[in-house]
């Protein structure tokens, strides 16, 4: 991830391709691709119990999350490519990008707690909850347990990343199972 850190712009933006010769900063290189700056160090820590990579990337993750927060002050963002591979279904890009904004913010809050950064922990925990609430308020039909239009990605991404309210997880999971 040293290349990630080297390629990050001062404002927090990462390019589409890492390493890059300068290309990929002005495209839709948003959260669904560049969340690697947070997800990889966190999962290395979870798997190995080694926090070195998390420590090394902490300021970069923070700069990245702060950038997204500046461009998405309401907690929702459509910055990114979205789920562009499926031929027949189209997922809402604002839904998937906002979930990854939540993921990165939650990882940052957890890393802050682990590293004893109490003020950061409080701030980013509150921000993560704001994002989670914004996603659920806009995209979750609480009666049906369906996110967005109900396609697989729109159901699976909130489940995978723990956006779904506890009392609705079964319902959302059943809806996903119907799509598979």
Predicted region positions:
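Active-site core of glycosidic bond-cleaving carbohydrate-active enzymes
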Residues: 1-180
């Amino acid at each position: 991830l040293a290349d990630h850190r080297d390629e990050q712009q001062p404002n927090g933006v990462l390019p589409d391709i890492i390493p890059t010769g300068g290309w990929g900063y002005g495209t839709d290189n948003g959260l669904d691709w560049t969340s690697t700056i947070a997800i990889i160090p966190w999962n290395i820590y979870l798997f190995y119990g080694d926090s070195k990579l998390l420590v090394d990337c902490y300021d970069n993750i923070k700069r990245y999350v702060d950038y997204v927060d500046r461009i998405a002050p309401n907690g929702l963002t459509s910055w990114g490519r979205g789920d562009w591979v499926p031929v027949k279904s189209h997922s809402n890009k604002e839904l998937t990008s906002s979930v990854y904004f939540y993921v990165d913010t939650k990882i940052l809050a957890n890393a802050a707690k682990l590293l004893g950064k109490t003020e950061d922990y409080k701030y980013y925990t509150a921000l993560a909850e704001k994002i989670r609430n914004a996603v659920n308020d806009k995209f979750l039909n609480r009666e049906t347990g369906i996110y967005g239009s109900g396609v697989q990605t729109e159901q699976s991404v909130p489940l995978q990343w723990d956006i779904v309210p506890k009392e609705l997880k079964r319902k959302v999971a059943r809806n996903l199972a119907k799509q598979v």
